[in-house]
Amino acid sequence: MAFSEELRELAERVSNWGRWGDDDQAGTGNLLTPEAARRGAACVVDGAALPLALPLLGEGKGVQVGQPAGRLNAVLTFTTMNERDPMAPGIWTGCDDQLTMSTSAGTHIDALSHVAYDDLLYNNRSTDTIGAASGATWCGAEQLRPISTRAILADVPRTLGIDWMEPGQAVTADVLDACIERAGVAPEPGDVLLIRTGDVRYYLNGDRRRYAVGEN
């Protein structure tokens, strides 16, 4: 399905192609500056860490359900089990293992080479820059900047006075503005916006397919 003319015009208006030069491969990652990192560090009050991870292993726990095709949940294989090191006999034993998984098996960050439109990647480069043997020679994951910055939580359900968003309910610019106003924080270049929809309830209630692909 082709993009509408309205969406094309919007994309051109907010495009960052050429903003940091024609040879740039980091995009808005260029905004992740030392100043942005210091701004994030200055927000720490009590140092509490909030885990956001979901299980990758275990029957019925991985988030992948076979759609899109080729995305598999992680498979754990033990390669050594309580084996003695021949270089240190009688001193210690160890275990080792390996994970076989799709790179999209769980939470991840897409490189700018992940998707294209009209056969063009970020900064007007052809998808011909991607090969099965060479990988992405333009905008590969190695071009991603380290992320150490301030995050702003846009809690959509709480802002709208609901428990979670329903299928088909849009997160509009006005909704995000209301979330940010509620958070009481003025966004600055290099900040990260964390959008909560409440959709994880499907996963927690055992409906992995609804969580993964948005349908029953």
Which stretches of residues belong to each language-model region?
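Active-/binding-site microenvironments in catalytic and ligand-binding cores
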Residues: M1-N216
